[in-house]
């Protein structure tokens, strides 16, 4: 498949992060591409609670699906320790990390701004034993590249988890750093809490 711009989100008070009033709506081109699925149960929507439709939505806080893809727990702490100094004033950590560190969350979505942040960097692959052994160099790189999975439910939580992509050469990379045609298999790796 090919990636498409599906939705635009606008936070009125970025200093309040996910607690900010939020307006959101599907992109017209995306709706036209999926016209036969508008307002159907199994549409290619960002969430079952936000079906494809032509209306703009508004909530007093971020839509729930964002909590499922934003870094949380161990991933959030690690990322803020590493890149927190880059956070602009006037934006809370959750929005900063959403825009910076979610190029490949679980599911069929990507945060476009996070993917653009990572473009131009050289991809570094790791052998399976480095991943299994939780090699520090590997973990730091994986977190920095957005392979760490956050969120309050599902794949998120406190235990470190990573989405990885395996290349034809057998090396493992944080998901989204390799072009889709270079990937032969995807891996979801969950480490113990300690």
Predicted features along the sequence, with ranges:
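Phosphate/dinucleotide-binding and metal-coordinating scaffold of catalytic cores
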Residues: 1-194
């Amino acid at each position: 498949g090919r990636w498409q711009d599906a939705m635009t989100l606008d936070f009125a008070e970025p200093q309040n992060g996910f607690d900010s009033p939020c307006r959101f709506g599907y992109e017209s081109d995306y709706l036209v591409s999926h016209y036969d699925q508008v307002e159907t149960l199994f549409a290619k929507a960002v969430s079952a609670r936000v079906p494809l439709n032509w209306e703009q939505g508004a909530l007093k806080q971020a839509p729930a699906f964002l909590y499922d893809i934003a870094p949380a727990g161990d991933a959030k702490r690690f990322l803020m320790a590493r890149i927190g100094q880059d956070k602009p004033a006037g934006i809370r950590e959750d929005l900063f990390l959403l825009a910076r560190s979610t190029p490949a969350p679980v599911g069929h979505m990507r945060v476009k701004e996070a993917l653009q942040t990572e473009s131009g960097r050289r991809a570094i692959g790791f052998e399976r034993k480095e991943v299994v052994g939780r090699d520090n160099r590997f973990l730091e790189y994986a977190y920095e590249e957005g392979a760490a999975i956050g969120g309050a439910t599902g794949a998120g939580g406190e235990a470190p988890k990573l989405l990885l992509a395996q290349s034809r050469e057998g090396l493992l990379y944080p998901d989204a750093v390799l072009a889709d045609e270079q990937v032969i298999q995807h891996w979801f790796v969950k480490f113990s809490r300690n």
